[in-house]
């Protein structure tokens, strides 16, 4: 099983990952339990890797965003960003396509979304009807420039490991290119492809596979120290 880190400093980084052969074709409302499973969190090791990777280029990043956040202002800044994301994405949240969560322990925001809303089965081309959602997210990201954006894409276990990994990476590139056209600062952005390696639910059922075909968009504050 292979996991890749894609660092793409000249493009943007929202990653949609999906099943190789079995994305949901019909949209349905997700239950509260299913939404909770989609929200989830990456493991401590994975989040630590994100932070460590960003810290290696922290000096250039702070300069590029005009200085880092400090003190109590960090929590307030991220709270406001979470509220604006929730406000902008209310239709998608009501349909069960997107969730937004604020983690108080590290001031991280997690935007989770179902893969089927962004791509058709086996496709790496964004659905035209989904670009308005991406526009909303890009608008908020541009309003809150003192953050980094790390996107982790996931698939279910249908298909080979290699196919699922490649599919997630190609879908990442499609969204990265879209966000680049929306002027999100490239130095803030990176993406990981996880393929099928981190399921949130049982791949033995269609409901579980639908939950595993997801995207986790992590937004972290740029700290001055």
Model-flagged regions — what are they?
Residues 154-225:
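Periplasmic OmpA-like peptidoglycan-binding domain that tethers envelope proteins to the cell wall
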């Amino acid at each position: 099983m292979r996991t890749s880190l894609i660092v793409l400093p000249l493009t943007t980084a929202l990653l949609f990952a999906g099943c190789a052969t079995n994305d949901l074709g019909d949209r349905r409302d997700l239950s509260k339990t299913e939404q909770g499973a989609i929200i989830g969190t990456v493991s401590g090791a994975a989040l630590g890797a994100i932070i460590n990777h960003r810290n290696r280029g922290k000096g250039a990043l702070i300069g590029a965003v005009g200085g880092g956040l400090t003190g109590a202002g960090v929590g307030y800044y991220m709270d406001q960003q979470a509220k604006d994301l929730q406000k902008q994405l209310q239709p998608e949240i009501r349909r069960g396509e997107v969730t937004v969560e604020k983690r108080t322990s590290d001031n991280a925001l997690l935007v989770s979304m179902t893969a089927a809303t962004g791509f058709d089965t086996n496709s790496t081309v964004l659905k035209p009807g989904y670009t308005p959602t991406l526009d909303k997210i890009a608008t908020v990201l541009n309003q809150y420039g003192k953050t980094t954006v790390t996107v982790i894409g996931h698939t279910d276990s249908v298909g080979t490991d290699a196919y699922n990994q490649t599919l997630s990476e190609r879908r990442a590139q499609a969204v990265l290119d879209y966000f680049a056209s929306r002027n999100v600062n490239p130095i803030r952005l990176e993406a990981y492809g996880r393929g099928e390696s981190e399921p949130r639910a049982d791949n033995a059922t269609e409901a579980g596979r639908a939950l595993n075909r997801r995207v986790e968009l992590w937004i972290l504050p740029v700290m001055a120290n």
